[in-house]
Amino acid sequence: MTYLISILIPTLIERKDEYNTMMKGLYEQIKKHDLKDKVEIISICDDRSISLCEKRNMMQKLSSGKYFVHLDDDDEFSCDYCEKIIDHIQRIPVFHKDEPDIIGYNQLAKVSGGRFIVKPHLDATLRLTPCGNQIDPDGKIKEGIIPEFYRYPWQYCLFHQRFKTVYRTESDSPSPDKPHMFDDLNWLKKVQLEHPKKMSYIDFIGHTYNFDDPSKTTTQ
């Protein structure tokens, strides 16, 4: 069976509560909108005997969806995440001659009490770049708005199956407690070398990055 999307989630035995909460939400969406033949979920759970890079590579190899997306077991996603994405993919022939390389959507980032929106753009760099007239004359974000930034599509966006063979490699990290902090970034640099030409954009907040409480995140 060829699914439209493959959702790839690495986890750990010690993270079963977070993982079960996430999976419950995904399967409720799949059941509600009858998407069992369109959405594939692949997970690898271990006791840290397999590196995070290796787990993500293994799941990419196993995936059969037209597009794949990497999520973490503590990620938050919208209540209509699966429905929105599947509906968008099914309508792609209406507004795209060829299948796009990437399907992107917005991320809400919660960091140390602050809030901002990250929008994907193929012409953006891997760093956050302010978009729109949000900066005051002093170079600060204007008060009363949620700032928006452009960034190259991150791993929570959907990548065409042709990128399945773009694999991760272990990277050196300057932070001993975060050994994988550059793995995702280096993978995206490899994706860039494949020269993605088209991105289809869904204007909704599909993913939430919650770093208000760093203790709730994990380094696998």
In which residue ranges do the predicted regions lie?
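Short, well-formed alpha-helical segments that are part of the catalytic scaffolds
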Residues: I9-I30
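Glycine-rich, basic loop-to-helix element that forms the pyrophosphate-binding segment
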Residues: D47-S63
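Acidic donor-binding/catalytic loop of UDP-sugar-dependent glycosyltransferases
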Residues: D75-H88
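A short, conserved acidic/glycine-rich loop-to-beta-strand motif
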Residues: I92-L108
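Short beta-strand-to-loop element that shapes/binds the nucleotide-sugar donor at the catalytic cleft/hinge
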Residues: I103-H121
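Active-site donor/metal-binding and catalytic loop motifs
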Residues: K110-F116, I202-Q220
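Acidic donor-binding loop at a coil-to-helix junction in glycosyltransferase catalytic cores
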Residues: H180-W187
